[in-house]
Amino acid sequence: MSNPDRSRVIRLAEAQASLPANERSVQVWQRGSLDVAFALPVPPKQQAPHSQDEIYIILRGRGMLVHDGRRDSFDSGDILFVAAGIEHRFEDVTEDLALWRVFYGPHGGDVAPVGTSS
């Protein structure tokens, strides 16, 4: 018998089907500090800085991520990273934008050791 806390497949179709009416995101899995949601962001919306590091995995659509004094374009298949405490928002996005939003790590962010480029 499998243990869903040890391994799991999260299906896009199931996440989309579980999205509550009139909602733009739904949590699909949580384990320890890991928190995964399916989201259909509506810009322009300034995101409040989060207490954990955050990854966006772009499933479809494209747009701009405004973060840390920068504007970076993104497209489906891209992965975006925003460190804990950084203000950010999406702009100029296509109507079909859909993504996985992943929070992880300790509150305050996961700090790379000094001397590394990660």
Model-predicted regions and their roles:
Residues 32, 66-70, 93:
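Short strand-coil-strand connectors
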